[in-house]
Amino acid sequence: MSVRHTIRAMYHMEQSWFSRVGQFTDSIEEFLIAFFMGAMTLLTFANVIMRYLFNDNILWALEGTVFMFAWMVLVGASFGVKRHFHIGVDVLINIAPARLRKLYALVAVACCLAFSILLLIGSWNYWHPFITERAWYETDDIPMPDMLQFLADWVNEGERYEKLPRFIPYAALPIGMALLTFRFLQIAWQIITGKLDRMIAGHEAEEDLEALKAELSEAGEAMMPKTQGKEK
């Protein structure tokens, strides 16, 4: 097998690997965002019903909602990179010659990668003690589900949890930053392979303006037969 064929085979293997992992990551992100958004909405609604109809409340509703919102935001940051939802400035890329756009894009994604890796390291260092020497540290109000009591044997020396241990909701930090780092690696690979020349894939204002122009054009075409009929 020639060197060219070997390089081509390695390229397709890398592309296939990124594609499979990317699809799996898509499923995780979409499931977590949908689950926590739905659960947060239902919990808030149930708490309102309890308060106004039964003069009672769900004690752990506020704390649970805060943790679910944190999960949704941290996972949503990764999902936003995938869908190009984040705000970016591409003035330099637009005025740069085509041969330099890839370089500018690689510099931008390298800065984002450095930032996300620092966040990943910091979030891991913050979360890790809560699953080791601080595994006993529980949340204030959220009860521990019976189906998760097996974790007590794994990390809490068999001592049963009454409330949800903090390492479970705090896991949003390393998981969210790991997903974010992977998304930046994915963007970097797309830039290297020529699929993208920038991290920003769309411009919301320009897209809205184009849509408005199209609507005005259609409205003008619809009015033309009526105007011509009146002239006759």
Curated annotation (Swiss-Prot):
Keywords: Cell inner membrane, Cell membrane, Membrane, Transmembrane, Transmembrane helix, Transport. GO terms for cellular component: plasma membrane. InterPro entries: DctQ, TRAP_DctQ. GO terms for molecular function: transmembrane transporter activity. It is found in: Cell inner membrane. The chain crosses the membrane at residues 30-50, 58-78, 103-123, 167-187. The keyword ATP-binding does not apply. It is a multi-pass membrane protein. GO terms for biological process: C4-dicarboxylate transport. It holds the Pfam family DctQ. Part of the tripartite ATP-independent periplasmic (TRAP) transport system DctPQM involved in C4-dicarboxylates uptake. Belongs to the TRAP transporter small permease family. The complex comprises the extracytoplasmic solute receptor protein DctP, and the two transmembrane proteins DctQ and DctM. PANTHER family: 2,3-DIKETO-L-GULONATE TRAP TRANSPORTER SMALL PERMEASE PROTEIN YIAM (PTHR35011:SF2). This is C4-dicarboxylate TRAP transporter small permease protein DctQ.
